[in-house]
Curated annotation (Swiss-Prot):
GO terms for molecular function: hydroxyacylglutathione hydrolase activity; metal ion binding. It catalyses: an S-(2-hydroxyacyl)glutathione + H2O = a 2-hydroxy carboxylate + glutathione + H(+). Zn(2+) 2 binds at D70, H71, D150, H188. This is Hydroxyacylglutathione hydrolase. It comes from Prochlorococcus marinus (strain MIT 9313). Its cofactor is Zn(2+).
Amino acid sequence: MEATSTAATSDKQRSSIHALPVLQDNIIWIWIKGNQAVVVDPAIAEPVKTWLRTRKLSLAAVLQTHHHADHIGGTLELLRDWPNAAVVAAAEDRDRIPFQTISVRDRDKVSLLNSSVEVLAVAGHTRAHIAYYLPTNKEDLEDPAVFCGDTLFGAGCGRLFEGTAEDMFKALQRLSCLPAKTRVYCAHEYTEANLRWASALHPEDVAISERLADVSSRRQRGALSLPSSISEEQRTNLFVRAQSSKELAELRHHKDQWRN
C-alpha cells in the first residue's frame, strides 16, 4: 500500500513524497528528488532499504520529529548502509537521539535536496517534538508540506506524554497558521478512529460526517487517508478547532478514555 503526493513525477528533478506504511499503523514518509531521498521517522529499516534500492535511490538524510522508538528504531541500521546520510533532530533531544548529525532548534532552516526546510518547535506529545515545513516552490513542490510526526494527526493530535495541554494548543495553533493548502504528513494512520470519536461527539457536524464517510471508503479499499491538508484539519479536527488549552485538555481526556 503506497500513497503518493507529487508535483510532477514525470520530471525526475522535481520532488515527490511517498508513503511507506509499516508496523500496525506507522507511516514512513519518503521525499525524493532525482536519485536522492530523505526519510522521515523510520520506525524500522528493512522496508525502507528495499524501497530505496528498488528505485536506485540514495539516502541523503533522515528527519527525526521526536525520540520515540517507533520513529527512530530504523535509523542506525539505515546509517550502516548509507553512512554519509545526515540525521536531523532537535538539539534538545541530543541525549535521546545521540546519533543526530545536524542539531536544530525552532525556526532553523536546513538545506535538503536543494530545498530549504524550516524547523518548527511543536512540543506537547514530547517536550522536544519538532516538525519540518517545506514552503511552496512552483519549480518543485506545487503545495507546501509539513512533516508533523505525532503532533497533528488526521482529525486528531498526539497524546500528552511529556507536554501540557497548553503546549499542544500552541503547537496546533502554530501549524494551523500554515497556508491552508499545506499538505499534512503525520506519522500514524489514525484518521478513521479519530473521526468516529469526533462524530460521536458531534453527530450533527456535516463536515466531520462527510470526511468520515470518505475516509472509511478509502480504508475499505486499502488506501491511506493521508496526507490531509491544513484546511481539512481546520474544518474537521476538534483539537485544531479548540478555542483554548482548557477545551483541548477536556477533549484530550475524553479521547483518551473513549473506546470505539
